[in-house]
Structure formats: structure tokens, C-alpha cells
Amino acid sequence: MNVTFLGTSSGVPTLTRNVSSLALKLSQTAEVWLFDCGEGTQHQLMKSNIKSSQIKKIFITHMHGDHIYGLPGLLATLGLSGNSNGIELYGPSELKFFVLSALKSSYCKLSFPLRFKEVEDKASFNKILFENDKLKVHCACLKHRLPAYGYRVSEKDKPGIFDIKKATDLNIPPGPIYSELQAGKTVKLKDGRSFNGQEFCGPPRKGESFVYCTDTVFSESAINLSKNADLLVHESTFSKEDEKMAYEKLHSTTIMAAKTALLANAKKLIITHISPRYTQKSLIKPSTLLLEAQKIFPNTYLAKDFLTAKIK
């Protein structure tokens, strides 16, 4: 899996950063899952290597405009392109009213179904939000000025590496049989021999995990959601020098994001949702924010629009 940052600015777009959106590209399928959809997201998609037709799920963290104003326009465009299978939208209960009101008011009729999934109950009781045979999604309540939710996508453990040499040495014919053996199944050959697939595979490989936390001030629930994550994407709106403002607005500083990653034992941190007050011409620059976080959590990176990063 990998992520592409489509918007990394806090509150308003700038000449170099659009407002919040991130695309998660799944390695198991051709699907793309979108996290937040600020104004201008569909323009960012056009400039990226992400195909909007592959978007199957959209996860909204909260109802502030810089995270949702691009949603009606994107859905309308997808409707013109004929996304026949529909899209699932996860988020606060107000999300359905916002989207349907915008579409109705603009006389927009989509050619595909929308399926809304409210996340409040799942977040409050730490229940699984979505699960299939390869992935599961959890969410958690964050700490912001209005209800906000972080999301965790966890890949289930994968079969161990298949020992092809062992199979060929035993004259097992290549083809679909190898796939069955790799899945751990017992296979019977035409010559009467039977083989247990588990004898040909190494130990299971741990699946990848990705966590997206924005908007929030320092939060225990964000730490718990991020436990042992391979990649944590965490908002870092303010410098440590502006900590007072962070607490007033319930946003995170670089130090808060780094401490969350450290306490969660995350493998890698990418900070995003950068306040437009920090520019190359300001006293505190974006590079300053990165250095602040790296002093606490060395394996930290600074997000920028169109950055693509592997989960693991």
C-alpha cells in the first residue's frame, strides 16, 4: 500500500499546498480510498497519478470545510464518468445531510449509489468499521472543536514466502497448485501424492498498517489508535512556539504529533495539515517544523502536495 498527499495545508489553500486530502492506494486491489476531500481535491487528483475512477471509499474525519468542501464536486464529476458500483462514505452523521443537500440544491443526480456509514458508535466502542478478507478499518474519537475521527487501515497477515525450490524438487507441477499450497491448503496430485501447503511456506508475514489522525490536539485515543502502526499521518498545524494557540484551537504542534508517534511505537511519522503562517519567508519555516518533530521522533517526514510514500 502507499499514500499520496493531495492537500497538506491547514484551513485554507496556499500557492503550494491545497487543503486536506489523502489517497490510499491498495496493493491487494485496484481500489483507492480517499481520506478527507477539501476544496480543489479533484484538481489535485488530475495532477496526480491517482485515477479518480478507482475511488471506492471516502473517509471524512470531521465536518470543517477544509476537509469536505471538495466532496460534492468530486462526486458530481464521478457521476459523469459513470462510477456504476457506487461509493461508500464514512464519517460523522452530518455528512449525509451535507452531501445530499449540496447535490439536491444543484440539481445533480448521480448515476451511481452513495452508501453512507456513520462512524460515531464504532469509534466510541472501538468496533471494526469495515472488514474483508484482506483488510480491516478501525476509527477513534479525536479531540477537536467538533466531533472528529481518526482512521486506521490494517492489512491482515499474509501467507509466508512460498518455497518454490522445495516444490520443484518434489516434482510438483507449477500453476494453480502453487497458489493453493501458498494459501496453506492440502493438495492432492493426479499421481496420488498429497501435500500440506503449510510445509512449503515460511512464517506468516505481518500486514501493513496506516493511521490518519486529523484534526486533533494531543490525544490518548490517537496514541491507542496508532499502536505499532507502520505509518502514522498526523496533523501538525503549529510549531512548538505556538503551543498556546494549538490548545486554544485544539490542533497539534510538531511536538504533540511526534510524542504520539513515540508513545504509540509507530514506525514512521509524516506530519501534515501545516498552517499557512509558516512559509519559506517566515521566521518559522516548514523545515523548522520538521526539525522540531525529528528531535522527538527521528523517523519523521514533512508532507507536501503530491508526495507519495510507502506504508512500510
Curated annotation (Swiss-Prot):
Catalyses which reaction(s): Endonucleolytic cleavage of RNA, removing extra 3' nucleotides from tRNA precursor, generating 3' termini of tRNAs. A 3'-hydroxy group is left at the tRNA terminus and a 5'-phosphoryl group is left at the trailer molecule
Domain of life assignment: Bacteria
Keyword match Ribosomal protein: no
Active site: 66 (proton acceptor)
Provenance organism: Prochlorococcus marinus (strain MIT 9515)
Annotated family: Belongs to the RNase Z family.
Cofactor binding annotation: Binds 2 Zn(2+) ions.
Keywords: Endonuclease, Hydrolase, Metal-binding, Nuclease, tRNA processing, Zinc
Classification via CDD domains: RNaseZ_ZiPD-like_MBL-fold
PANTHER family the record matches: ZINC PHOSPHODIESTERASE ELAC PROTEIN 1
Keyword Transport part of the UniProt annotation: no
A Pfam family per the record: Lactamase_B_2
Residues reported to bind Zn(2+) 2: 66-67, 215, 273
Protein name: Ribonuclease Z
Top-level class of the enzyme under EC nomenclature: hydrolase
Subunit structure: Homodimer.
EC number(s) stated in the UniProt entry for this protein: 3.1.26.11
Cofactor names: Zn(2+)
Role description: Zinc phosphodiesterase, which displays some tRNA 3'-processing endonuclease activity. Probably involved in tRNA maturation, by removing a 3'-trailer from precursor tRNA.
Residues that coordinate or bind Zn(2+) 1: 62, 64, 144, 215
